[in-house]
Amino acid sequence: MLQVQGVFKSYATPQGPLAVLQGVDLQLEHGSSLALMGESGSGKSTLLHLVAGLDQIDRGSIRAGRHRLDQMSEAQLAHWRRTEIGLVFQQFNLISSLPVEDNLAFQARLAGRYDPAWQAQLIERLGLGALLKRYPEQLSGGQQQRVAIGRALASRPGLLLADEPTGNLDEATSDEVLQLLLDLLKNTPTSLLMVTHSPRVAARLATRVVLHCGRLADAGER
């Protein structure tokens, strides 16, 4: 279970501190999903980065299972990211020196959870079969996004963090990715926290949470 309690975050600017999150509380149960929505600058991506341990909170607490993330060292956070979560951010961060098939398996191997049968299923579901020997620079933005999604899912993470997971995909591929995520949520204990601007994506996948000016403004069931 993921618990975000009373989280504040601000950044220094030439005009003074900019408050991005102001006392946000969220709870995400095992096997459930939550969609963060709201206008640009409302704090959605910031919250996702804080939950991933990629930035430090100013005040509050973030717990994921037995871990208190805001009290972990950088080394502990790095190990946690490698072994327990999957990340799909708008910067795909594929490894340029590895072909698609090795990019897909990279995190699963680090986590000690590489499963050839599961990887083959991901390759088929994401339509990556013809791309396995290509390198990231040879892929379109949508193709890179599909590889990033497959890499994040390959280790069957307990928590999947996704920032606009279907943002660069055509509608048919987007629907296939959404169905893959729904199947994963249904058949495994994976939890999903995602940022999306798409009401259609949020309605299919998740309970909706709206942030406004760094505060929780609204929440509703899908």
Question: What are the functions of these language-model segments?
Answer:
Residues 213-222:
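Conserved switch/coupling elements of ABC/ABC-like ATPase nucleotide-binding domains
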Residues 2-213:
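ABC family nucleotide-binding domain
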